[in-house]
Amino acid sequence: MKIAIGCDHIVTNEKMAVSDFLKSKGYEVLDFGTYDHTRTHYPIFGKKVGEAVVSGQADLGVCICGTGVGINNAVNKVPGVRSALVRDMTSALYAKEELNANVIGFGGKITGELLICDIIEAFIHAEYKPTEENKKLIAKIEHVETHNAHQADDNFFTEFLEKWDRGEYHD
């Protein structure tokens, strides 16, 4: 199984620990960054993870930022992604079994590393239960998706990053 993973600069260490855990369990990890602590932007990495999952390059995705809120919002903008921001086992299992979530999000500064790893392992092993009710819920979720032609542009974030480099945005 291939698992895509991405994070922002705030939780690079946590992402690397999760990546190492997944590799120790025999999973192939596709690491979409970031790879250091240089200030960066979580939407970039959420988008990359989401695209890898939707394209079939990865089977599942894991997104981590400080609280998990930002990167999870970003990955959920990729059409075809159903990501759940979780902090507990119950939410993660519900997301996979009932809503067929294909990405799971965490706040690396909110949820401990060992718990994150336990939740991910349970999420991987959980199976979607395709009941009529669950299918209808997923169809309703998919119905509100919007497709933005600009999302497919490889330079989607270029203007934003150039402005950042010029000092037009600040933390």
UniProtKB/Swiss-Prot annotation:
A GO BP annotation: lactose catabolic process via tagatose-6-phosphate
Enzyme class: isomerase
Known pathway: Carbohydrate metabolism; D-galactose 6-phosphate degradation; D-tagatose 6-phosphate from D-galactose 6-phosphate: step 1/1
Record bears the keyword Isomerase: yes
GO MF terms, alphabetically ordered: galactose-6-phosphate isomerase activity; ribose-5-phosphate isomerase activity
EC numbers: 5.3.1.26
Protein name: Galactose-6-phosphate isomerase subunit LacB
Species whose genome carries this gene: Streptococcus sanguinis (strain SK36)
